[in-house]
Amino acid sequence: MPEISRDQVAHLAKLSRLALTEEELEQFAGQIDDIVGYVSAVQNVDAAGVEPMSHPHSIATTMREDVVHKTLDAAAALDQAPAVEDGRFMVPQILGEGD
């Protein structure tokens, strides 16, 4: 079974922009290693001839009545926004012009 090192967890944390303590790095290395072991065990199960399914039990689709409820109006939603322009949410630009 592959062992996940503390350095690999530190690298993943850096890529994810997570600040982890040394204790957390050791803890997560063990937990991730356990998860990899569980996945490996599942991959080794002989599932030949097993029909794919979404749920182990037969469940009839249940439908609920479509009822219209009062929702938040635009003015109330915009009232909670940090920035509004021309009646719309104003957000920072993430793409350059022409993108």
Swiss-Prot record:
Keywords assigned by UniProt, alphabetized: ATP-binding, Ligase, Nucleotide-binding, Protein biosynthesis
GO terms for biological process, alphabetical: glutaminyl-tRNAGln biosynthesis via transamidation; regulation of translational fidelity; translation
Gene3D superfamilies: Glu-tRNAGln amidotransferase C subunit, N-terminal domain
InterPro entries: Asp/Glu-ADT_sf_sub_c (IPR036113), GatC (IPR003837)
GO MF term list: asparaginyl-tRNA synthase (glutamine-hydrolyzing) activity; ATP binding; glutaminyl-tRNA synthase (glutamine-hydrolyzing) activity
Record carries keyword Plastid: no
Keyword Nucleotide-binding appears in the UniProt entry: yes
Pfam families for the chain: GatC
Signal peptide limits: none
Reactions listed under catalytic activity: L-glutamyl-tRNA(Gln) + L-glutamine + ATP + H2O = L-glutaminyl-tRNA(Gln) + L-glutamate + ADP + phosphate + H(+); L-aspartyl-tRNA(Asn) + L-glutamine + ATP + H2O = L-asparaginyl-tRNA(Asn) + L-glutamate + ADP + phosphate + 2 H(+)
EC number(s) recorded for this UniProt protein: 6.3.5.-
Primary role: Allows the formation of correctly charged Asn-tRNA(Asn) or Gln-tRNA(Gln) through the transamidation of misacylated Asp-tRNA(Asn) or Glu-tRNA(Gln) in organisms which lack either or both of asparaginyl-tRNA or glutaminyl-tRNA synthetases. The reaction takes place in the presence of glutamine and ATP through an activated phospho-Asp-tRNA(Asn) or phospho-Glu-tRNA(Gln).
Family according to the record: Belongs to the GatC family.
Subunit structure: Heterotrimer of A, B and C subunits.
HAMAP family hit by this protein: GatC (MF_00122)
PANTHER family (alphabetical): GLUTAMYL-TRNA(GLN) AMIDOTRANSFERASE SUBUNIT C, MITOCHONDRIAL (PTHR15004:SF0)
Name by which UniProt lists this protein: Aspartyl/glutamyl-tRNA(Asn/Gln) amidotransferase subunit C
Gene name of the record: gatC
